């Protein structure tokens, strides 16, 4: 019972910290069983795919929904540091602007 309670507390904390960045594209495809993304690529209805920009998209009846899958760093010195997205691993690193070989402290991440 304690294990179950502990698991629920961790899950609730994780859900509270999540703040996905999503957007919707109205489905303007002339075909009823597919969606067309902004690049003109057709996707079957109810399909899910990942983009090269670290987004996961879903083709729905009325729209395509896309959400960011890379955790975005927050709580770092934006004057001194910059975030860099590695599109191969869908992860950010935060480095000094003047010396990109040095990493910066990050106090939070938002998904």
From Swiss-Prot:
The keyword Chloroplast does not apply. GO terms for cellular component: extracellular region. Coiled coil: none annotated. Keywords: Disulfide bond, Pyrrolidone carboxylic acid, Secreted, Signal. The modification Pyrrolidone carboxylic acid is found at residue 21. Homodimer; Interacts with PI16. Belongs to the beta-microseminoprotein family. This is Beta-microseminoprotein. It comes from Sus scrofa (Pig).
């Amino acid at each position: 019972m304690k294990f179950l309670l502990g698991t629920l507390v961790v899950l609730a904390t994780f859900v509270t910290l999540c703040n996905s960045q999503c957007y919707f594209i109205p489905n303007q495809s002339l075909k009823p069983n597919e969606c067309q993304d902004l690049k003109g690529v057709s996707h079957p209805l109810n399909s899910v795919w990942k983009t090269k920009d670290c987004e996961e998209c879903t083709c729905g009846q009325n729209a395509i929904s896309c959400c960011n899958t890379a955790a975005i760093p927050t709580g770092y010195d934006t004057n001194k540091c910059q975030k860099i997205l590695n599109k191969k691993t869908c992860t950010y690193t935060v480095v000094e602007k003047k010396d990109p070989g040095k990493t910066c402290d990050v106090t939070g991440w938002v998904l």
